[in-house]
Amino acid sequence: IVGMVETIYFGGGTPSVLTNTEIEFLIQTVYDHFEVIKNPEITLEANPDDLVGLSLRAESRSIFEDYRKIGINRLSIGIQSFFEEDLQLMNRAHNSAEAKKCLEEATKYFDNISLDLIYGIPGMSNEKWKQNIETALSFGIPHISSYALTVEPKTALNKLIQTGKIASPRDEVAEEHFQILVEMLEKNGFVHYELSNFGKENYFSKNNSAYWLGKKYIGIGPSAHSYDG
């Protein structure tokens, strides 16, 4: 693959478990071996519990400040939901308070932030889903990725469904939630620029857009894949 590197994306797994030194080394390695455009988009995926925990042992005042110093200029944070019961149902490591605290801190240091929200969760009413979206918007986040809940085999959630303790996700509910999502985000200035992604102008993910435009990319690490055109 030849050409200038336009984006660097630390995907998951959970790359926020890496130390700052390790992340900085990986970024520098890209610069050492490839030509990189000026001011590339450099994204780090992270979970709220990691970010809140890392801030307690940050080298400077905040882990977010540390990330800025080593070259990260975009964060993708796996919020999933702001409701405690949803997070517990999905067996997430963070809680609602950590999700909000994480975004409060992140927005002090980063303008370019994306968060993930899950819809179609059993027991989630349309009103509750609207509250999730409203909470996300209240932080001034310029990009939201949203996906329907999928139930994987051999997970705690799947066991709860199989034993009848909770209902299975319903396609018609997920469809309603998606329509609510589109309407609310477009009303608030977001563009539905890709199947699961919504962004304000100048905040579309360059990395995601490159996939859809058929640009070449190199994947590095376990289960990573590349595309050479």
Indicate residue ranges for each PLM-predicted region.
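C-terminal scaffold of the Radical SAM
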Residues: I1-G229
